[in-house]
């Protein structure tokens, strides 16, 4: 049997397949709120948080999330690892620890060998095990378009967690993975020259757990953090700035990029989701004239299983860096937070 490349079976790859933020915002605004939320919910849907935090008996809390997407690589095992790491990331971004997970599967079982699905599931299971969580089942649907991910339940201290609303003036912004996965995934899907190397780079970073960043949040009691996924670095920073009523300043020259990303963007290669992100955010962004427009595109590139943005008070920066180094986790200092003032944009991109 001739097997198509996994990435050829979907319209968009990874988190770039998300519904555009503006469309999603309009749809969700029509839904009523459950009046019982206040009894149980510590953190809900109001500020576009990465996950929900819900009280349970005994003074404890769980953190709950769900994430799945279409393939961004052709290797099934690697796809399973990336999809699982991406789903687990939401728990880490709140400061929680993954506890158990359920598989979410859509697969054309009559068209593709069963071994492909087995490899996807094996990749996901290995990553869940690496996170210290337990895989306890799942649900599958026969579908022409391959999709895989997890529903993850974590444990968390109901009095110590990070959200989009916790930015404070002076906070230093640390990023724990380089940017460009949306661009590289588009190159892989299109089969561009060198796409095999791009796939390996996507696997290197996408399958990396954000566990070290979660440890920083817990041990230092950080109030603000998020992970960078489908709305891009710019979109997720803007969510934090809006929720916290702050202005976020990014030093674009410090942003880490995956290999070849800048060259690919220069040729015009950018996923549709990235264009949608930039358009949606444009009214709240100020770009210094010396900032390269290609870098602005990358700021809004739709990421899959991206790094954490950690907002660290100045007096805790050294401690945060020490924890990340002890975990052998990469990180970059990319900007800071200021109070909103007259004529100041929510998101400022400076050289």
From Swiss-Prot:
Task: Spell out the residues of the site Important for catalytic activity.
Answer: 18
Q: Which GO terms describe its molecular function?
A: ATP binding; magnesium ion binding; selenide, water dikinase activity
Q: Which residues form the active site?
A: 15
| Textual note on the cofactor | Binds 1 Mg(2+) ion per monomer.
Keyword match Cell membrane: no
Pfam annotation, one family = AIRS_C
> Known InterPro entries for this protein?
PurM-like_C_dom, PurM-like_C_sf, PurM-like_N, PurM-like_N_sf, SelD_I, SPS/SelD
Which leading EC class covers this enzyme? transferase
| Amino-acid positions noted as binding ATP in the UniProt annotation, renumbered to this chain | 18, 47-49, 67, 90, 138-140
Q: Which GO terms describe its biological process?
A: selenocysteine biosynthetic process
Q: Which reactions is this enzyme annotated as catalysing?
A: hydrogenselenide + ATP + H2O = selenophosphate + AMP + phosphate + 2 H(+)
Q: Where does Mg(2+) bind?
A: 50, 90, 227
Q: What is its EC number?
A: 2.7.9.3
Listed under subunit, the entry gives:
Homodimer.
Write out the similarity annotation: Belongs to the selenophosphate synthase 1 family. Class I subfamily.
Protein name, as recorded: Selenide, water dikinase
Which species expresses this protein natively? Answer: Nitratidesulfovibrio vulgaris (strain DP4) (Desulfovibrio vulgaris)
Per UniProt, what is the name of the gene that codes for the protein in this document?
selD
């Amino acid at each position: 049997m001739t097997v198509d490349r996994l990435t050829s079976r979907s319209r968009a790859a990874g988190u770039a397949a998300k519904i555009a933020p503006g469309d999603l915002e309009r749809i969700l605004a029509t839904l009523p709120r459950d009046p019982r939320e206040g009894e149980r919910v510590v953190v809900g849907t109001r500020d576009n948080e990465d996950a929900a935090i819900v009280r349970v008996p005994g003074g404890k809390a769980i953190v709950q999330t769900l994430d799945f997407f279409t393939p961004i690589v052709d290797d099934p095992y690697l796809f399973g690892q990336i999809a699982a790491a991406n789903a687990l990331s939401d728990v880490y971004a709140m400061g929680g620890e993954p506890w158990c997970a359920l598989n979410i599967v859509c697969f054309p079982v009559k068209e593709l060998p069963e071994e492909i699905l087995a490899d996807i599931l094996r990749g996901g299971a290995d990553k869940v095990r690496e996170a210290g969580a337990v895989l306890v089942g799942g649900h599958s649907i026969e579908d022409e378009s391959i999709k895989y991910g997890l529903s993850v339940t974590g444990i968390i201290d109901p009095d110590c967690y990070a959200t989009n609303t916790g930015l404070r003036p002076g906070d230093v912004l640390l990023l724990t993975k380089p940017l460009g996965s949306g661009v590289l995934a588009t190159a892989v899907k299109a089969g561009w020259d060198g796409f095999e190397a791009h796939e390996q780079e996507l696997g290197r970073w996408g399958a990396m757990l954000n566990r070290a960043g979660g440890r920083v949040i817990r041990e230092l009691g950080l109030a603000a953090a998020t992970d960078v996924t489908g709305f891009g670095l710019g979109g997720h920073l803007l969510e934090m700035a809006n929720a916290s009523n702050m202005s976020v300043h990014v030093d674009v020259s410090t942003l880490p990029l995956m290999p070849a990303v800048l060259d690919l963007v220069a040729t015009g290669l950018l996923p549709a989701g990235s264009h949608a992100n930039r358009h949606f955010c444009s009214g709240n962004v100020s770009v210094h004239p010396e900032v390269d427009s290609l870098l602005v595109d990358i700021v809004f590139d739709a990421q899959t299983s991206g790094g954490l943005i950690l907002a660290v008070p100045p007096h805790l920066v050294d401690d945060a860096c020490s924890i990340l180094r002890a975990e052998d986790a990469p990180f970059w200092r990319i900007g800071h937070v200021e109070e909103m003032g007259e004529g100041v944009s929510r998101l400022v991109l400076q050289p």
